[in-house]
Each structure stands twice: as structure tokens, then as C-alpha cells.
Amino acid sequence: MAAPWASLRLVAPMWNGRIRGIHRLGAAVAPEGNQKKKRTILQFLTNYFYDVEALRDYLLQREMYKVHEKNRSYTWLEKQHGPYGAGAFFILKQGGAVKFRDKEWIRPDKYGHFSQEFWNFCEVPVEAVDAGDCDINYEGLDNLLRLKELQSLSLQRCCHVDDWCLSRLYPLADSLQELSLAGCPRISERGLACLHHLQNLRRLDISDLPAVSNPGLTQILVEEMLPNCEVVGVDWAEGLKSGPEEQPRDTASPVPA
């Protein structure tokens, strides 16, 4: 009967050794599992942020495409209905309003619908355009520059209107008398300097232009540039109360401070 007990005594160390070996193996495997888990999380975060960036780029490109489509040229429509009809249609599609000479204002409703009656006025000059909050950009101005009798133009809060757009307004110099640029975030002093062609302007609104670094001084310069124009929207002393060392610096200027 001693033999079985002896066999057990011989087997026990071997079994215990295997258990210890398994534990040591588990301890060696554990870090690799943690590393794999970390790699999985890192890969997830990489893919996640890549997807977010790709989505952002896609939405940006989609928005740019929509703006481009809204500002396409209506030359084909001009051939059928003339420049007044094509220009009016462009503004109304953008959500703006137009006024033909001796007619009432035509505006779209809250759903973007507007009366087709304006097609009856295609031979009547457009004398006023309210394009406030519209998506007009540099290319879209082609549809307005053909309105040679345009007297009043409002571009308030047009986020795509910039200095380059103002440089294109000179074809309206003979007729344009009122211009509103209030709230346009991309218009600076450089763009306002391009308005020297518009010597028939009688009223110019340049209020709330965040890209203008010194509104008070800018208004003074614009008034000298357009002596027959009433420039409104800026306190002449704004930006002139602080000393020269406190003046905000134009970071886009190539001239060092």
C-alpha cells in the first residue's frame, strides 16, 4: 500500500511545477494582452478622429459646392429675359428682394417662394436690390453688374462678400447712390479703398466691420475719398482714443511694426 502514496508524492511536485509554470506563462502573456488592448484603443481613436476630420472636410466641400451653385451665371436666362429679369431672378433665388422702377418691392416668403409676376417687368430697370444675408460671392456679382441703372444695393451681413468683391463694383459707378456693407465680416480697409470709383455714392454704411482694425480713422479716409457721400455706422473717434502704442496691429500687413 505504500507504493500508491509514493507515486502521489512523486506526482505532486511535478503538478505543482506545472501550475507555477502556467502562472508564470500567464504573467508573461498579460502585458502582451494589455498592449494589444492599448493598440486597439489607439487604432479606434485614430480611426475616429480621421473619420471626424474627413467628415468635416466633406461638409466644408459640400457647403462650398452649394455656394458655387447659388452663384452660377444666368447668362442663358439673360438671353431669354434680359439682364433685369435674370438679375432679379438671381437675387430672389438667393432669398433677397428687388425693386423695379416705379414698382413695389418683390420679396420671397419664408419658404423661399416668390411671385412670378416679376417676369412681366423684364423691360423695366431694377433700381434697388436688398441682398442682405445672401450667399453672394465674387462670381455671383456677374448677375448684378449688368444692372446698369441700379441705384441702391444692400450687402448687409453677406459672409462671402470680401475685398475682391468690392473691387468689382466699378461698372455701377454711374448709377449707384446707396451702398450698405454693414456686418460683412470679410471686408477690410483694402476693400473700402476700392470704392473710390463710386463717386456718385450719396450714402455708405460701413458699420460693424470686424476686419477693419481702426474704424474711426477708416471712416475719415473714406469721407476724404468720397467727399459727396454720407458715411455712416462708425463713431469717428472710435480707435483714436488710445495712444499709438495701443493701436491694434494689422497682422496681415507686410510692413513690420
Swiss-Prot record:
Phosphoserine modification, residue list: 253
UniProt keyword Mitochondrion present: yes
Gene Ontology annotations for the cellular component aspect, listed alphabetically: mitochondrion; SCF ubiquitin ligase complex
Record's keyword annotation contains ATP-binding: no
Sorted UniProt keywords: Mitochondrion, Phosphoprotein
Swiss-Prot/TrEMBL GO biological process terms: mitochondrial respiratory chain complex I assembly; SCF-dependent proteasomal ubiquitin-dependent protein catabolic process
Subcellular location: Mitochondrion
Highest taxon listed in the record's lineage: Eukaryota
InterPro entries: LRR_dom_sf
Function statement: Required for the assembly of the mitochondrial NADH:ubiquinone oxidoreductase complex (complex I). Involved in the assembly of the distal region of complex I.
Family of the protein in this entry: Belongs to the ATP synthase subunit s family.
Subunit relationships: Interacts with incompletely assembled mitochondrial NADH:ubiquinone oxidoreductase complex (complex I).
Protein name from the UniProt record: Distal membrane-arm assembly complex protein 2
Organism annotation: Homo sapiens
Encoding gene (name): DMAC2
